[in-house]
Amino acid sequence: MTAIQKPVVAKREAPKAEVNPTVSRSTQTETIKPTKERTVSVFSPPVFNFAANSFAQSVSNEYKHASPKRIKLDNSRVQVPSIVKPKQDKPRPPAIVTKPRVINIEFPNKQKSGFKLLIRPKHEPSIKKQKQGIEVLSTSNTKRITKSISVDDVEYVEKVKHAIKQVLPKPDYDDGSLGPVILRLAWHCCATYNKFTGNGGSNGSTMRFVPEITDDGNSGLDIARSALEPIKQKFPDITYSDLWTLAGKISIQEMGGPKIPWRCGRVDCIDDRYVPPNGRLPFAYKNANHIRETFGRMGFNDRETVSLLGAHGLGRCHKRFSGWEGKWTENPTSFSNDFYKVLLDEEWSLGTVPETGKEQYYNKDKSLIMLNTDIELIRDPHFLHFVKLYSQHQATFFQDFANAFGKLLELGIERDSNGNVLPKNEFY
């Protein structure tokens, strides 16, 4: 029989590398001759500097205390990097945002404060966990907050109230108080509620996320959030949604307004999946129909609507934020019915803000302003009735405002018989 010859398989040679003369290499064994330095030098182009250093270190550590003898080379542990041409990397897509972004805010007293802007990419999957029978939706870049302080923790609430009162006076900001802008924060975080869909409102503090934080109507509210952030850090058990609404209540009362009903227990959303769409806040340049539709969407009637708009007697417009400029009343840090009185008593003429081109109404000496939605309150006969009522009876205005604002703070919140907020699974 003819002998079958086995095919000759070419042996694959290991990549060569230059080594120190103190290391002599054969095909299968290696003789280590100890030297004072006990180092192995390996030639490598700059791109392989890290690999070469790692190889040299591994050989040095392997035979640091070895005596002169022949041992087998462990190729699985000691590998000499071959000299190859570096591959050209393909263009990579933009990196996914996986960490909270911190916005540094220049505060009026020249101090800087940080506010976390949490962003969850739309395509990032959620991680589902089980916690006490409730499905928990979590992401890698947010801290899960499942509940706020208890309704029975009166002492804790009082401490938070005291801390809020301390940040309100600000002599170098606007008219000397942060009360109006903090009230606006509380107002806007609630005014996204939609009674037809059931989403929006203060529960969840969704203004921490885009797109709500970038809504044009919320421009300038970073000042209020920044002022309250140290309180949140000092009292971590209270949620942002409870803190912001409580701060709105305290601001009204500290500026001489009525006592506002408020209860704790709101939760904070863990990501942006339940952020309402932008455009739900009232637009100041629109007409009475827009006002009625916007407030009607939240569940308010004409009387409640006019009473809530009386808060325009506080604070002022800033052209750097909204494009409008000026104050509504002579005492913008004092809660009263002056807004209605000024609206009826002054003569208003349409003008523009020179720097922005935005239209607004001025009184004769241009010391006070009104927006188009304000003027609509005296154009619409149904709204005008309540404007006249509140201009003549401040006590009635205070009572109606307290009821309407308390209702605003509770939009979208369900409670049990003990006052505890009933959890919504989508917030957890």
Swiss-Prot record:
Belongs to the peroxidase family. Cytochrome c peroxidase subfamily. It comes from Debaryomyces hansenii (strain ATCC 36239 / CBS 767 / BCRC 21394 / JCM 1990 / NBRC 0083 / IGC 2968). Keywords: Heme, Iron, Metal-binding, Oxidoreductase, Peroxidase. It is an enzyme of class 1 (oxidoreductase). InterPro entries: Ccp1-like, Haem_peroxidase, Haem_peroxidase_sf, Peroxidase_I, Peroxidases_AS. Binds 1 heme b (iron(II)-protoporphyrin IX) group per subunit. The active site is at H188, W328. PROSITE patterns: PEROXIDASE_2, PEROXIDASE_4. One of its GO terms (molecular function) is heme binding. Its EC number is 1.11.1.-. The record marks R184 as: Transition state stabilizer. This is Putative heme-binding peroxidase. Residues 21-32 have a biased composition (Polar residues). Its cofactor is heme b. Destroys radicals which are normally produced within the cells and which are toxic to biological systems. The keyword Iron applies. One of its GO terms (biological process) is hydrogen peroxide catabolic process.
